[in-house]
Structure formats: C-alpha cells, structure tokens
From Swiss-Prot:
Entry-linked SUPFAM superfamilies: YcgL-like
Protein known as: YcgL domain-containing protein Psyr_1564
Domain YcgL: 3-87
Alphabetical list of PANTHER family matching this protein: PROTEIN YCGL
Any Pfam family matching the protein: YcgL
Species this protein is from: Pseudomonas syringae pv. syringae (strain B728a)
Length: 97
C-alpha cells in the first residue's frame, strides 16, 4: 500500500513533524493538536510504502496511523539523543582547585 504523504514541520518545536495524506491535507488533524503544533510549515512530499525506510520512525506505524487517524505525529528525539557530551577534562577545566 503506497501513500502520498505531505510532511509539515512545527514552528513551535524543533524536529517535530506531522505526516498527513496529501489528498486530505490537514483536514483530519484534531484542532487541539493543531494548536499545540503551531501553524504547519510544509517541508516536503513523500511516497510512503512498507518497503521504504524512515530515519526515525517505523514505516509500518506511520502507515497505520495515516490509515486509522489520518495523521502521524513525529516527536523530537529524546534530549540524550542529540546532546553532545563533553570529555571529563573539559567539564572540570573551570573547577576551583
């Protein structure tokens, strides 16, 4: 089952994306979610199929959500996923002796 999907990014939260069927635009997205998401900014369109891999989402979950509720919300990664951890000597550089 192939789906043509429009992907929107949130102006409120970095790396938050909303996947919707291109034919539905944003009609099936609940108003409460739209308020929390902010005014959607179109990022790109994509053809989704079970064979296609997505970098941070399970394609089968995305397709199921598109079919059942009309949208899929991709949340930003957990903080630990994108924070660079500094070496111990840099962390202690300004510590008092």
């Amino acid at each position: 089952m192939k789906r043509i999907c429009s992907i929107y990014r949130s102006p409120k939260r970095n790396e938050m994306y909303l996947y919707v069927l291109k034919s539905d635009v944003l009609k099936r997205v609940p108003p409460e979610l739209m308020v929390a998401f902010g005014k959607p900014v179109h990022a790109f369109d994509l053809v989704l199929s079970p064979e296609r891999a997505l970098s941070r989402e399970d394609i089968n979950v995305v397709l199921e959500n598109l079919d059942s509720q009309g949208y899929h919300l991709q949340m930003p990664p957990a903080e630990d996923d994108y924070i660079e951890h500094l070496p111990e000597e840099l962390l202690r550089r300004n510590d008092p002796m």
